[in-house]
């Protein structure tokens, strides 16, 4: 049984899906498509020799990790990939803190990095998950600063809650590590 069928209670649409919200199966496909695009791009880096999909392994499921990257010098790092279809137009990262009373992926991942992939533009932001959690915690404590920076709590669909964080704000913090484009130059927006 794979990770997704294990977590999905029913093959029926949720109430939110029936009301015109996103569709779980479509979101899952979009996420997997995004992961494959990013995986191919990672393999193109000269220092990378392999990108292993561990998302359905015990470690991948328990630690919420999508890929293990193997480098030429022998070291490895792990990544959780988030594919976002709206960030290019909203200008926000979506930090899902809770989903159906469970910690959201950014709140629970043990990956070394979050690769936040903007599907429409190909931009991939490399974020530090520990520092991202700390940053969100600080914003929850300093509501005035959060308001000034336009970071806001929001519902994110049925059973989900989190924060919208402006991309430009996060890029100026130590959460942001670097950025690259997943698409060949000819396809970049």
Predicted segments, located by residue:
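Non-catalytic C-terminal interaction segments of nucleic acid-processing enzymes
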Residues: 2-10, 14, 22, 26, ...
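Short, well-structured alpha-helical interface segments that form or flank functional binding sites
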Residues: 33, 62, 109
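Catalytic cores of nucleic-acid endonucleases
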Residues: 21-25, 50, 82-124, 129
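Acidic-basic catalytic patches of nuclease active cores, encompassing PD-(D/E)XK
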Residues: 2-56, 85
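Conserved catalytic cores of phosphodiester-cleaving nucleases, focusing on short active-site segments
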Residues: 42, 67-69, 73-87
